[in-house]
A protein has these predicted regions:
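Gly/Thr-rich phosphate-binding beta-strand-loop-beta motif of the actin/hexokinase/Hsp70
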Residues: 126-151
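Non-catalytic, solvent-exposed interaction/assembly segments
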Residues: 1-123
């Protein structure tokens, strides 16, 4: 999961020289790659690369490398994880953040000078963390619940 401080840090990210890739992708544990999931991702990547307007050569190279890295990550996570994946990448600026979300999100891929965090904000608004206390004779238990699970 992630916390509000990480979200604030991503929200403040802005770089006039480098482009950042914001990718949200739904995962289904054990989904075979041949089922079209990777084809959908490849179509998103091709669309993002085709939409370049004022990118420099170095920006294009950086974005291409970041998108290739995201593609490899998604291919691995499709087999291992379920829920959703949020990735923020700008390798020339040293940004590589991966968040595993307990619910599906996306698919969405945006290349811009800022991060696209609206889906994560909506996720936090929809699935808030809450606390439950069980009190018994001489004993109490505190549980923190969020979409990622229960913590005692």
């Amino acid at each position: 999961m992630f916390d509000f401080e990480e979200l604030r840090e991503l929200a403040r990210y802005r770089d006039e020289r480098n482009l950042v890739c914001s990718c949200y992708y739904p995962l289904e544990k054990g989904e075979p790659a041949g089922e079209g999931a990777l084809i959908r991702l490849k179509n998103l990547i091709n669309g993002a690369l085709a939409d370049r307007e004022d990118w420099t050569g170095s920006q294009y190279k950086s974005v291409s490398e970041d998108l290739a890295r995201i593609e490899i990550l998604v291919a691995e996570e499709l087999v291992l994880s379920s829920g959703g994946l949020a990735v923020f990448a700008a390798s020339t600026a040293g940004l590589w953040k991966v968040f595993h979300l307990p619910v599906k999100c996306g698919p969405m891929l945006v290349v811009d000078r800022t991060t696209r965090i609206r889906p994560m904000i909506e996720f936090l608004d929809r699935y808030r963390r809450y606390c439950t206390v069980l009190v018994g004779k001489g004993k109490a238990r505190i549980f923190l619940l969020d979409p990622g699970g229960v913590e005692e």
